[in-house]
Amino acid sequence: MKILLSGFCLLSFLSLSAQDSLTILFAGDAMMHQKQLDNTRRGDFFDLGSYFANIEREVKSADIAVVNFEVPLGGEPYSGYPAFSAPEDFALALQKAGFDFFLLANNHCLDRRTRGFVRTIQALDSLGIRHTGTFLDCDHRHRTYPMLLRKKDFRIIMLNYTYGTNGLKVDIPRIINYIDKEIMKGDIAEAKLFNPDFIIANMHWGLEYERIPSREQRELADWLLRQGVDLVIGSHPHVVQPMELRRGKEGVTDRLVVYSLGNFISNMSREHTDGGVMVKVVLGRKGLRRYIVSAQYSLIYSSRYKNEQGKEDIRVVPAASWLGKNQNSSFSVDSALIKY
């Protein structure tokens, strides 16, 4: 798996107490293709126990773990690309692995039309999984967006937008957060009223399979930062794109742009789509200062193997372990964390 990344620095400015720092982990596109459905089905449930076992410790080490949930929970018949519908077992497996915040604004959220759209929101609510990006109606959006997360006395705003929904239109009164500068500008202004420590914009954007961000991505990232966003985290291209740390006032590094995290888990086999990165960011505060204490990424890979039924199965592993040909051993993701 060949991945090219721009320089990504580990930063540390001030000593912090535990309550003065917050760790957030971001993972890319979580998808369930037809082969995954066929090979993990066990009667009326899906056995996904091996999917995330090798990276679970790393995910759970974060205070907040975020994933781009790029499949609707549309009910049966379950299906893969091009019109996804995944079982609740997929969401449960991610939750068990430590992911507690799902992003829903993506180009597949209408794959099962209005019924699947509504069912996804209701299913995640019933599982106790927080999410944003799609809404049942205006009242639902007004009550829950901008999404404010409170953790360790930090106040984090989570925003989420998509470039489109594969030509499908959402039925009134349902709402999807599309990329629209006027709407986003209003959302960011409203977010500031919460007096957040950090504002994070999760963007489903860019061109599939392109390993360099487009001009539109770069311009939009710059625009978001100018509006007051602190972290811009991208998804959709299914491949990893460069990451940038930005310095703000007084030379303090307080902003981060990740153009694309790549795939977290899928059955895609096109070059560079069989893996991605998990990005872990430690956010800090000291008095009135808000800044990035450290930023690091872990390369991950969707490793294929034969399960107990003799069918091809998938598990997410640290790329360093995979490259070391230790696929059948217990992995420590710490060995794959790359710090500069």
Regions found by a protein language model. Name each.
Residues M1-Q19:
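Bacterial Sec-dependent N-terminal signal peptides
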Residues Q19-Y340:
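Acidic, metal/ion-coordinating pockets
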